[in-house]
Amino acid sequence: MSPLSAARAALRVYAVGAAVILAQLLRRCRGGFLEPVFPPRPDRVAIVTGGTDGIGYSTAKHLARLGMHVIIAGNNDSKAKQVVSKIKEETLNDKVEFLYCDLASMTSIRQFVQKFKMKKIPLHVLINNAGVMMVPQRKTRDGFEEHFGLNYLGHFLLTNLLLDTLKESGSPGHSARVVTVSSATHYVAELNMDDLQSSACYSPHAAYAQSKLALVLFTYHLQRLLAAEGSHVTANVVDPGVVNTDVYKHVFWATRLAKKLLGWLLFKTPDEGAWTSIYAAVTPELEGVGGHYLYNEKETKSLHVTYNQKLQQQLWSKSCEMTGVLDVTL
């Protein structure tokens, strides 16, 4: 990617962000975001990645409030004990715990899955929520560009390693669910199969958007595989909107200033940002339904290229090669 292309990528990302913020402002002026009513889900088990902060924390808290056994997967050991205690206190649910998982390390992901499976409990909901946003160019422990490696590839590996447990846990009328958090930036993203690591000319904006596009393609292909084998597991992808969290530390200074001064008005709260993830995880309306892109608890169209099954397959096969996952679609 040339410097000019990198500049264009930044402009496109900020343009789509501004459009989402404007839509949120208009909705707030018309009455705001009303909290959906979610059914209780006792005796269900959920894993939430990135559950110590922001949208992930709100998601974990609300699932615990619904009676679920919630396992927070994260790499913030120092904050974990406080977060777990707070959620238990607020929800009166003692079935909340933390397991260390660094999504930037395949070794850590595999260790997390091993520890989880040693518990001998089912898994009904996996929420792929964790991520980084527009960070400077750097690599994961396995040598992947961080947006691609953590946001996308880490969740690709985690999901595949947990699929057997999800399949065992799902049943007719009570499907297990994979919920993956993408973003509106995928609408302005490009997937460069020849340079997934953004090594030619790094743009944090393009790299972030590409990782979110990859998550949509991954979800759609995963759903096709699950449906083809008749398993009682569904996969959907959600867009939380522009949410007032701490992930904006690397964005343009004007965006940080707007967030600081007007975030309360222009941005969704973390709870509001979590509602679509929770909806996808528990609503009876989506029982047995997968392959949807959800925004504000409603299905909407994703970028046209995400429906390209050949591209889905290419990314899936490449991801299997990168992670050592067996490509069953070959």
UniProtKB/Swiss-Prot annotation:
It comes from Homo sapiens (Human). Keywords: Congenital disorder of glycosylation, Disease variant, Lipid droplet, NAD, NADP, Oxidoreductase, Secreted. Oxidoreductase that plays a key role in early steps of protein N-linked glycosylation by mediating two non-consecutive steps in dolichol biosynthesis. Acts both as a NAD(+)-dependent dehydrogenase and as a NADPH-dependent reductase during the conversion of polyprenol into dolichol. First catalyzes the NAD(+)-dependent dehydrogenation of polyprenol into polyprenal; polyprenal is then reduced into dolichal by SRD5A3. It then catalyzes the NADPH-dependent reduction of dolichal into dolichol. May also acts as a positive regulator of starvation-induced autophagy. Transmembrane segments: none annotated. One of its GO terms (molecular function) is dolichal reductase [NAD(P)+] activity. It is found in: Lipid droplet; Secreted. The keyword Calcium does not apply. Belongs to the short-chain dehydrogenases/reductases (SDR) family. The active site is at Y208 (proton acceptor). The gene coding for this protein is located in the pseudoautosomal region 1 (PAR1) of X and Y chromosomes. It is linked to Congenital disorder of glycosylation 1DD: A form of congenital disorder of glycosylation, a multisystem disorder caused by a defect in glycoprotein biosynthesis and characterized by under-glycosylated serum glycoproteins. Congenital disorders of glycosylation result in a wide variety of clinical features, such as defects in the nervous system development, psychomotor retardation, dysmorphic features, hypotonia, coagulation disorders, and immunodeficiency. Its main location: other. The lineage of its organism: Eukaryota, Metazoa, Chordata, Craniata, Vertebrata. Gene3D superfamilies: NAD(P)-binding Rossmann-like Domain. It holds the Pfam family adh_short. SUPFAM superfamilies: NAD(P)-binding Rossmann-fold domains (SSF51735). One of its GO terms (biological process) is positive regulation of autophagy. Its EC number is 1.1.1.441. Pathway: Protein modification; protein glycosylation. GO terms for cellular component: extracellular region; lipid droplet. Changing T49M: In CDG1DD; uncertain significance. It catalyses: a di-trans,poly-cis-polyprenol + NAD(+) = a di-trans,poly-cis-polyprenal + NADH + H(+); a di-trans,poly-cis-polyprenol + NADP(+) = a di-trans,poly-cis-polyprenal + NADPH + H(+); a di-trans,poly-cis-dolichol + NADP(+) = a di-trans,poly-cis-dolichal + NADPH + H(+); a di-trans,poly-cis-dolichol + NAD(+) = a di-trans,poly-cis-dolichal + NADH + H(+). Widely expressed. Highly expressed in the pancreas. NAD(+) binds at I55, Y208, K212, T245. It is an enzyme of class 1 (oxidoreductase). This is Polyprenol dehydrogenase.
